[in-house]
């Protein structure tokens, strides 16, 4: 990430003249309504609506007949499919921060600074990055053994299509949303989601409280990126987390900016909108967002994330994967992990335990799959309806029903287990 000069702090008089957060929200709601009234994306230079109105065309998130809360099936350049928040009537991406830090940086980059905001040495920062990567990769390794994630990753046939549909499981984005330090910076087209994070304090374990101490938090900032369909997701560096199997990323209508792979600096493509913190406004927004439950609905994998974050060990598989990805020295990485209180269990493999599978069965009985499917929109009215019904009925489809049955887990993972056994024999 290139060096940026931080903005100077506002004076007390400048803060006094700022609008409160609710006034900022109302301002952008009006701008959004004006955008829609003036023709929306058809009134700007955007990607044209495809002539054949293909159900997964890249521009379907901008041109569709879906309700605002639906997630649009869009094909990526790599041939996979993402479930993007509907941008038909959403011209902005927002990010809220309760304090003005002078610039946007990811939680990963925050590790470069100590509690006094002093820059750590390159060696110390690298060590912290290594530990953060080990934790997030342990979580990702576990998610990759989730039966339904495996099914969606491997591809599904949805009638009347003859080719498999690969739903993109954004594992790194999921790690970000479940509390792991990553190089991602979250954005949302929902200004209320951004407003919530801008006026609340994180207490940990998905719990928040409204900011009421104006002395410690006199003003915050809403960062705004005006979407350009030809630039935002192709050149500027924004990507989609969107809807995943569990509801959290969908509730937050997640997009992200990846510091680590994008040459553009995010601070150059957003506008900071400052607001004066107000205790009554904070309480109002906190209540509107159901004390945070609107953005952090209960789900079982949040518990697994918390356990991994609190655990003092990671699997040998995760350690080896991290070593392969970063091409660092084995002994050095091992020493750094131990220095920071992380031991390597060479006999441990992340996988869904019988207890986790039982919890998944309970989730499915409580409507997890139906809730996931009912948020998805396939364009092309005739074909899209058939594909939706095919998706919804996968638990009854003999080709996929075993992914929904806990007792079939060993059969689902047999191929992966065999590959591990073969690799083990080669090492010996």
Where are these regions (language model features)?
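Catalytic-core elements of nucleic-acid end-processing and repair enzymes
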Residues: 1-428
């Amino acid at each position: 990430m290139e060096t940026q000069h931080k903005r100077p702090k506002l004076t007390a008089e400048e803060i006094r003249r700022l609008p409160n957060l609710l006034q900022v929200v109302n301002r952008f709601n009006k701008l959004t309504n004006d955008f829609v009234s003036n023709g929306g994306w058809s009134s700007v230079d955007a990607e044209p609506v495809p002539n054949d109105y293909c159900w997964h065309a890249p521009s379907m998130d901008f041109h569709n007949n879906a309700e605002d809360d639906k997630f649009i099936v869009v094909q990526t350049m790599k041939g996979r499919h993402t479930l993007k928040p509907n941008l038909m009537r959403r011209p902005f991406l927002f990010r809220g921060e309760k304090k003005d830090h002078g610039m946007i940086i990811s939680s990963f980059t925050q590790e470069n600074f100590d509690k006094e905001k002093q820059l750590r040495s390159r060696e110390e920062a690298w060590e912290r990055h290594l530990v953060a990567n080990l934790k997030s990769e342990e979580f990702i390794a576990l998610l990759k053994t989730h039966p339904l994630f495996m099914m969606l990753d491997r591809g599904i046939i949805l009638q009347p299509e003859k080719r498999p549909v690969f739903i993109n499981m954004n594992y790194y984005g999921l790690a970000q949303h479940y509390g792991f330090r990553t190089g991602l910076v979250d954005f949302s087209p929902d200004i209320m989601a951004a407003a919530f994070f801008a006026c609340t304090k994180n207490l940990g374990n998905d719990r928040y409280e409204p900011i009421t101490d104006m002395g410690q938090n006199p003003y915050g900032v809403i960062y705004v990126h005006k979407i350009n369909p030809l630039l935002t997701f192709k050149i500027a560096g924004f990507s989609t987390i969107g809807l995943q199997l569990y509801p959290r990323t969908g509730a937050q209508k997640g997009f992200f900016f990846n510091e680590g792979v994008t040459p553009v600096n995010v601070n150059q493509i957003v506008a900071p909108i400052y607001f004066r913190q107000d205790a009554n406004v904070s309480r109002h927004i906190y209540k509107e967002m159901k004390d945070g439950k609107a953005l952090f609905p209960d789900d079982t994998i949040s518990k697994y994330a918390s356990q991994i974050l609190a655990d003092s060990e990671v699997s040998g598989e995760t350690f080896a994967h991290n070593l392969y990805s970063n091409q660092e020295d084995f002994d050095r990485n091992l020493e750094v992990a131990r220095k920071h209180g992380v031991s390597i269990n060479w006999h441990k493999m992340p996988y869904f335990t019988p207890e986790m599978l039982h919890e998944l069965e309970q989730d499915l009985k409580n409507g997890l799959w139906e809730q996931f499917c009912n948020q998805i929109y396939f364009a092309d009215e005739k074909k899209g309806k058939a594909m939706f019904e095919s998706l919804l009925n996968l638990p009854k489809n003999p080709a996929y029903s075993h992914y929904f049955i806990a007792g079939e887990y060993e059969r689902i993972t047999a191929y992966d287990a065999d590959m591990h056994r073969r690799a083990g024999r080669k090492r010996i």
